[in-house]
């Protein structure tokens, strides 16, 4: 919660869509050139707007943070991928291991944490960047220790881990 300032943010449509998604969730998002100021103090919704998130692949990336903050989330299945259809199975398997229960109805993924998030050991069949990111963002709010085996090790994973650490998370061996 609070304000985050991101620099060197590219001027691309997915950033604009994600900014609108965050605003609809209750965040204040201000763009000044290549800088984004995001304040999430007033985020009060865990349901993403279908008409926006169904247009972009990155929509699944809000799942872990919303679950971590609210214990539940309703997110439209991802769309808008120029590469083609890609599965989100590893996201779901990893989050289920943390204690998330899922239901899919009419293209909307409903997630709940009946017993809260709990640390666990997860093995990813493939080192998916997106699944690793979602697991990290949810796991930092879980009770206990989480180990992600076969996690992605790209620079963006290291950057995310460093960012979460700067906000108080305890993460080791990222990347």
Where are these regions (language model features)?
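Structural preference for solvent-exposed beta-strand-turn elements
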Residues: 1-175
């Amino acid at each position: 919660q609070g304000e985050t300032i991101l620099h060197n943010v590219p001027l691309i449509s997915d950033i604009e869509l994600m900014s609108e998604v965050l605003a609809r969730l209750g965040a204040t998002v201000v763009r000044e050139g290549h800088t984004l100021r995001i304040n999430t103090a007033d985020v009060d919704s865990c349901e993403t707007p279908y008409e926006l998130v169904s247009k972009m692949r990155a929509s699944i990336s809000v799942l872990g943070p919303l679950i971590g903050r609210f214990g539940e989330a309703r997110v439209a299945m991802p769309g808008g991928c120029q590469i083609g259809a890609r599965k989100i199975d590893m996201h779901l398997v990893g989050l289920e291991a943390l204690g998330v229960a899922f239901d899919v109805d009419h293209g909307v993924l409903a997630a709940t944490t009946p017993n809260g998030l709990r640390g666990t050991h997860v093995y990813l069949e493939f080192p998916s960047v997106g699944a690793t990111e979602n697991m990290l963002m949810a796991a930092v709010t879980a009770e206990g220790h989480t180990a992600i085996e076969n996690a992605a090790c790209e620079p963006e994973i290291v950057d995310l881990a460093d960012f979460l650490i700067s906000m108080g998370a305890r993460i080791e061996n990222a990347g």
